[in-house]
Amino acid sequence: ISSSKPNLTVSNESHDISKLSPTKTSTVSIDAELVAQVGGSQIALYDKSGDAFYDLISAFHKSVRGSDPDAALYWYARILQGGGDALYVGRRLLAIASEDIGNADPRAMQLAVNAWDTFHRVGPSEGERAIAQATVYMALAPKSNAVYQAFNKAKIVAEQTSTLDVPDHLKNATSDITQALGHGDTYRYAHDETNAFAGGENYFPQALAQAKGYDTNFYKPTERGLEKQLKDKLQYLNQLNRESNDQRY
């Protein structure tokens, strides 16, 4: 910084400003270390839109995913220290709840929503702590990305088979014409079936259900948390489908 007014000259060897001459035009070299010494505090390594911001968020997310509540709280505090928005962290927790925890502990999603709501109701001081509470819970919750992976697979297959028509038994008969076409005629109402499950029914387009090369078993539950029970339930339903004498196709 150049100036025609009396100025400070700072060298790498000394930051003693009392020895600087006030009579000469000088160049001041200011770095984070100097400002920290003069101001008596450190400068947080953070900016709200650059790499440092995304690195901190990444460290936070990976700490929660890695089940380390202490590290997650540390990076959360670093984000706040640098002037970051606690609600951004709250949004990230909502993403973590579905991406990294999923059905292993569905309560994680509700806790993230509750933390978000608490922040808006009571303000930053108490709200930041609510987000910290959700952070700790999610870090220690059982982990599963089975839903995340299943949805990605479903989107790929849906894109590749987007021209397939909805099967007639799944269509809604909304007019005399659609009724005449037989829409919904052979639909099996699950509540009227044993255990409210229509064994052997198929809810995919016939061409997709019978096509080779497509794995439509998108959701593969883990053995962790509540998802273990969902896995057992899914295996039971699949068995009923295989053993049914009333196969759709």
Task: Describe each model-derived feature in a short phrase.
Residues S2-Q42, L87-L93, A150-K155, V166-H169:
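Conserved C-terminal helix/linker of AAA+ ATPases
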Residues S2-V10, P22-V28, L45-G50, D100-R107, ...:
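Conserved C-terminal "switch" segment of AAA+ ATPases
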Residues L8, E13-I17, A32, Y203, ...:
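Short linear motifs in intrinsically disordered/low-complexity regions
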Residues T23-Y46, Y214-L230:
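Extended, compositionally biased low-complexity polar/Lys-Gly-rich tracts
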Residues E33-A36, G40-R78, R91:
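Conserved helicase/translocase motor-coupling segment
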Residues G66-H191, N195-F197, Q210-A211, N217-Y249:
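Terminal-proximal interaction/regulatory segments of ATP-powered molecular machines
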Residues A198-G200, F204:
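Accessory helical-bundle/CTD segments and flexible terminal tails appended to RecA-like ATPase motors
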